[in-house]
């Protein structure tokens, strides 16, 4: 199965100007359009750009708004190129509801005061109209954000009187980092709105934090939820071929170590040939289900009468769902749809998203271990994950193969998706460090995590936010992207 390819977001761009300037200052309009093209070329590295060019009249503003709507843009970057009246900006956003980001990117860090004329100044006065734009947008009840800094050209254009080579300067680098974070946030939102999430089986009985209204989830994230039954999966087993199974076996051998018996847990042993064969078959079946139903993610769990055929089938889920997760089909156990969404968010921007919960606190090391009995995101593993044969899944029916692994050492982000008393989704975001600490050999994923807070202080802050008990673990510090994503989606968030 090939890895999921995510679509690029579509970003709108236009530059502001005052029509009266063009006759007064020949060449100014062309110079500002050069800056506009520079911004477009930078944006195009990570998104599809719909560039309207220069907006300098009310009529063009209305036309631009309609055009951006036709283009279905996720964000509109408003390049404040020079002074312009707010009357030539507000109509754009009254005609198109996409998120507004004002770009105040000055070309030069300092004017050549002795040689600067009015045209030179006007090419650098992008900050001048931003308060006016902000006031008009606010009074029209249109939300906006502003990015301030330097434009970031790598060389000074000919006939320019001030030095505009600013790509090396922190004010340019910070501005473009923020711009790219908004693009990543738009990538998340646009892909979620096109995603189909499977819900297979049911939610673990009694885990009240996991229960959420399917309609609410679609309304607030844009995902479509396909309700699936275990018989939908079982029916596909008849179509699994020996070559399908052989392919899964080869992938598994490449990705995993087959662990020996655990030295500490008698229930965690080296997987038997029979256990592996069953897991390979079920993994091939799971891939067929994903392909047949066009799934982008999956929440799953099954609990039925002891010893029935579906129980045997679900006992072998973890390997296949770990392989799917590595290919961009985020899979969350225990029927946790909200955490499946959080995992998908992480995978969309290439930072993993592994299914986790609190495992135990190591007070001597100052860490909290996070993990689960699976599935695991293999792409972000520290070394090769191990497969163990489990005599029992704690708290669940059945037995089979589980994954023992840890997330690679370095910066990580935990992303929780919970639900408030008002029925609104809420993100809880924590940046931390994955350490090279010890873990148990019990056939579960575990990662020792050190926060800037003492473990008890972190728990104090986390538990006050009423989280779900699962979360997605991603590599890298991604809070700035996830907060922007929450703003785009209109959902609450809290950074701890």
Region spans (language model):
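Short, well-structured alpha-helical segments in soluble
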Residues: 61-73, 90-94, 283-292
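Short, acidic/small-residue loops that bind anionic groups at enzyme active sites
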Residues: 91-117, 121-132, 320-334
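Cap/lid and interdomain-hinge subdomains that line or gate substrate/regulatory clefts
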Residues: 4, 8-11, 111-245, 249, ...
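C-terminal catalytic subdomain
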Residues: 322-441
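Short beta-strand elements in bilobed, periplasmic/extracellular small-molecule ligand-binding domains
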Residues: 33-57, 143-149, 223-228
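Long, internal scaffold/assembly segments composed of regular secondary structure
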Residues: 246-340, 348
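Periplasmic-binding protein-like
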Residues: 73-82, 101-103, 295-300
């Amino acid at each position: 199965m090939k890895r999921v390819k995510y679509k690029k977001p579509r970003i709108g761009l236009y530059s502001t100007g005052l029509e009266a300037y063009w006759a007064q200052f020949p060449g100014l309009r062309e110079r500002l359009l050069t800056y506009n093209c520079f911004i477009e070329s930078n944006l195009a590295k990570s998104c599809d750009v719909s560039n309207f060019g220069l907006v300098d009249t009310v009529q063009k503003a209305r036309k631009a708004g309609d055009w951006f709507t036709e283009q279905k843009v996720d964000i509109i970057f408003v390049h404040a190129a020079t002074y312009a009246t707010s009357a030539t900006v507000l109509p754009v956003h009254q005609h198109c509801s996409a998120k507004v980001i004002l770009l105040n990117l000055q070309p030069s860090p300092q004017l050549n005061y002795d040689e600067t004329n009015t045209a030179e100044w006007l090419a650098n006065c992008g900050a001048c109209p931003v308060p006016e734009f902000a006031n008009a947008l606010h009074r029209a009840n249109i939300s906006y954000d502003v990015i301030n800094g330097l434009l970031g050209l790598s060389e000074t254009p000919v006939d320019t009187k001030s030095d505009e080579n600013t790509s090396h300067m922190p004010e340019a680098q910070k501005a473009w980092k923020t711009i790219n974070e908004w693009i990543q946030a738009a990538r998340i939102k646009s892909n979620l709105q096109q995603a189909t999430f499977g819900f297979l089986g049911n939610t673990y009985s009694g885990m009240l934090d996991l229960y959420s209204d399917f309609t609410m989830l679609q309304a607030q994230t844009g995902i479509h939820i396909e309700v699936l039954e275990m018989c939908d999966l079982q029916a596909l087993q008849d179509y699994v071929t020996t070559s399908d199974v052989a392919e899964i076996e080869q992938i598994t051998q490449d990705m995993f170590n087959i662990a020996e018996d655990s030295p500490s847990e008698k229930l965690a042993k080296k997987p038997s040939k029979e256990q592996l064969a069953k897991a390979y078959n079920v993994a091939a079946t799971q891939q067929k289900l994903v392909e047949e139903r066009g799934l982008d993610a999956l929440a799953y769990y099954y609990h039925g009468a002891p010893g029935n055929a579906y129980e045997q089938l679900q006992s072998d889920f973890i390997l296949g769902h770990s392989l799917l997760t590595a290919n961009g089909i985020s899979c969350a156990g225990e029927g946790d749809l909200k955490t499946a969404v959080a995992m998908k968010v992480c995978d969309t921007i290439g930072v993993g998203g592994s299914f986790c919960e609190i495992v135990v606190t190591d007070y001597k090391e100052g860490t909290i271990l996070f993990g689960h009995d699976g599935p695991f995101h293999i792409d972000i593993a520290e070394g090769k994950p191990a497969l163990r044969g489990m005599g029992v899944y704690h708290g669940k029916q059945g037995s089979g193969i589980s994954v023992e692994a840890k997330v690679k050492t370095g910066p990580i982000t935990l992303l929780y998706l919970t639900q408030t008393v008002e029925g609104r989704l809420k993100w809880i975001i924590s940046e931390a460090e994955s350490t090279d600490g010890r873990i148990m050999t019990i056939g579960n994923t575990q990662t020792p995590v050190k926060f800037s807070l003492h473990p008890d202080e972190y728990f104090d802050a986390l538990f006050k936010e009423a989280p779900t008990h699962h979360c997605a673990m991603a590599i890298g510090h991604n809070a700035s992207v996830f907060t922007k994503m929450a703003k785009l989606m209109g959902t609450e968030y809290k950074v701890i």
